[in-house]
Amino acid sequence: MVNKENARSVGQQVKWIGSQDELPPVKNLEHKNVYFYQKCIYGPLTLSVGDFILVSNADAAEPDTVSGCDVARILHMYELRELTDREPCRAIVQWYSWPKAIPHNKYDDDEVAIDFSLEVIEEHRPYDNDVALGAIYRKCIVLEGTSKTSAEEILKRHANKLKSTACPMFVSRYRFVKVKRSYRLIPLEIHLEQPEDNARPTRSSRKSLTAHRESKRSISARHDDTAGNKGSSVEKRRRASMAASSSVEFIDVNSFICENKVSPIKIVGGRSVVRLSEKKNAPEINANYLPASPLTEKNAKVETPKSRASAARRNLNLSLDRGADTTADSDCLNYSIVQQTPDPKTPSNDMKIKLRLSERRRSVRLASMDVDPLSLEEAVQEPNAQGRKRLGVANGDIYHTPTKKSKEPLESAAATEQTPSTRRKSILKSATSRLAEGTPRRSIHLSNIVEQRVFEDDEIISTPKRGRSKKTVQDNDEDYSPKKSVQKTPTRTRRSSTTTKTATTPSKGITTATATPMTPSQKMKKIRAGELSPSMQQRTDLPAKDSSKSELQLAREQLHVSVVPKSLPCREREFENIYAFLEGKIQDQCGGCMYVSGVPGTGKTATVTGVIRTLQRMAKQNELPAFEYLEINGMRLTEPRQAYVQIYKQLTGKTVSWEQAHALLEKRFTTPAPRRVTTVLLVDELDILCNRRQDVVYNLLDWPTKSAAKLVVVTIANTMDLPERLLMGKVTSRLGLTRLTFQPYSHKQLQEIVTARLGGSETFKGEAVQLVARKVAAVSGDARRALDICRRATEIADTAAVKCVTMLHVQQALAEMIASAKVQAIRNCSRMEQIFLQAIAAEVTRTGVEETTFMGVYQQVETIAAFMGVTFPPPGRALRLCSKLGAERLIISEHSRNDLFQKILLNVSADDIHYALRVEEMVN
């Protein structure tokens, strides 16, 4: 924070030029003693209202460079005549953001083309626009242009005028403004009413946006003389906000009736969006309104007939070519909506769909229909002779195509007359089977308005349906009637798993065999193309299980502690408390600390990270201000001061020494920055960071108390009384009183957690899960330990070739988990190795010294072997046993070159040896 001495020094460096201005309506300054000016001199800079400047970003790695600054335009300059800690000479600015600071999903629109090296974007997010003049690095130049002109062209256009300047130059063509409930990139030539207001536009404003699109032109076009003469008598109207994706817009149906030109159709992201034409005269209020897609009104433009027709062909062909196959057999699909109106003075409601398919694709798609439902107009050009020859049809009857052949005998013997029974009010073609060569399929989709408007009730088209099974054909054999004979030409035959067509609907009659399962990417492509429609059952079902894995293997994978569960059972109250704390701090953009404690395995880290994921998802949906998330774990640090290095690396991506990282973090969290977002820091295993000086923990808990930091720290430790037992008083006071304790899980909660992980699998019996839950809850309540025991039980059951885990398997796993690893290693040793360990323990007990020699141990080996009736080993074999136990780290021994005088030391306790080598187990 700037102290008073620095504030006075900065104020003395600023020299105001001109007289004081009237008080403009600036928020937060209405009740303060301030004087506004138009111009000033600050050091070597001469600043005026309207100048573009570079403001140093305190959060950047190099704030004294162009890349470490933010671009802004000065709106007001004022001097604060009150004694505060802030700098008195300040400015109100309009921010401009670098393209990398805008979410990447905002660039998905095909009409947005950003040059990341030259452009800046006018920012309308609620950043603090009050900056000190001392933070200004230098002046710059921002050239505003239209979205139809590239950034390089704008720079070249002003190159001659700006040759002498050495200021950095940028181009601005878009603004990032809030429309309805989300932020969007809007070209500068589009002026919106109250861009940051969430209120819905009125119907008149929507009509103004629809009816007066022609006034949405470039900035250069506004200064054109001809455009100025034409528009001198027309009053400028402010544009309404663009329609959001969640809202419902209304358009007049009469615009479809009176429009007699081709409207371009653009396919965006697999969805077909009809670009509607507007009426040239202002629309009247009509009760006959239909809801339309927001994208429809967004893409609406007023164009000349020639440019509109060319745009239709260009947009449609580009959209189709992007998703088409690169092979020679790819579809050639083109369609548009035209009116069958020979005289433009006599409008008609009859509309037709003009469709052009490749001959090869047409012969496959329309083979099962006697008359194609999408008949061409008489003026459509007929296919060439070669295409007619390939189709086997006569001139003027290009859609009477022969039916397909099938290798099933029933299809060649009987065919049904086409009697469509079910009709739909759409021109949506059903997905057909793929060609053998792999020709991609594509369906035709139009909006509901066009579907209901294009065809009258007596012109509704039936959709071809697939053939039914053999059983249906045999049961309904008496309903068949002979079909009209049609001249057939040789077509490509395919193997079929079904039989002839039914009498009710026109069908393909040919269904391919079961294909290989589709990958998720292929499935999503088909859903976007409209060939598949996602159902609720498909979204809720679990992913397909791998047939090569058994049920026990799948259960073992789900029981692993590293698997992230879909939900956190039994921690709903703790989740809500952490969520409320973090959400409030992010909303208020202030700092704070929270201490989370609990025994290991109680879900502390999982609950906090689950809250963070929820908050990040809300921030992406613009329901919460953006924030940064950092995470450090004391177990992953070589020493406590490395926490500074990890935090700075996550903030900037650079690795520096801990001294430099500490200095830079101290500067960052104590220096105010107007565009700084809230930072959430998760410190796991806080007790490991507690060194003797406790400086690391003190700094991590002291930074959130700074008003300029906007830092929220969530600390996690296993000890409930860590602040009072280990931390000093000044550290404990900064930790605050916001504490949350995770209690150990009860047996019912552990049983619920294990059952949720199994996900309805029948690999565990209920009493087996209950036994694990009760055993673990009685000892520690550690959910990780319960999952490990269940996982080990599945391994034991899998080894025994059993498909279900019983209580015997759980008891065996419990016995292994309760015993230590050293005890397990001793039990798995050979008989002579166990005798050697027993001899070492006996020699240590006899001498009272933990360190002994091989000679004394060998004497004990001879005695124990004679007592147990075992042939005692020779000294050479005993030396080999000593070396093997030393390699297993059960004992610590010198090099074997010392022979009988090498020193031996037990690496396990004598109690572990006696526990592992009980007399009854040795006898057995």
Swiss-Prot record:
Assembly behavior: ORC is composed of six subunits.
Domain annotation BAH: ranges: 45-187
Keyword DNA-binding attributed: yes
GO BP annotation list: DNA amplification; DNA replication initiation; mitotic DNA replication checkpoint signaling
SMART domains: AAA, BAH, Cdc6_C
InterPro entries xrefs: AAA+_ATPase (IPR003593), AAA_lid_10 (IPR041083), ATPase_AAA_core (IPR003959), BAH_dom (IPR001025), BAH_sf (IPR043151), Cdc6_C (IPR015163), ORC1/CDC6 (IPR050311), P-loop_NTPase (IPR027417)
Entry binding sites for Mg(2+): D684, E685
Cellular component GO terms, alphabetical: nuclear origin of replication recognition complex; nucleus
Modified residues (Phosphoserine): S293, S368, S426, S430, S533
Similarity remark: Belongs to the ORC1 family.
Gene3D superfamilies found in the cross-reference section: 1.10.8.60, 2.30.30.490, P-loop containing nucleotide triphosphate hydrolases
Official protein name in the record: Origin recognition complex subunit 1
GO MF term list: ATP binding; ATP hydrolysis activity; chromatin binding; DNA replication origin binding; metal ion binding
Species whose genome carries this gene: Drosophila melanogaster
PROSITE patterns: BAH (PS51038)
Upper taxonomic lineage: Eukaryota, Metazoa, Ecdysozoa, Arthropoda, Hexapoda
Keywords: ATP-binding, DNA replication, DNA-binding, Magnesium, Metal-binding, Nucleotide-binding, Nucleus, Phosphoprotein
Annotated positions of the Phosphothreonine modification: T419
Gene: Orc1
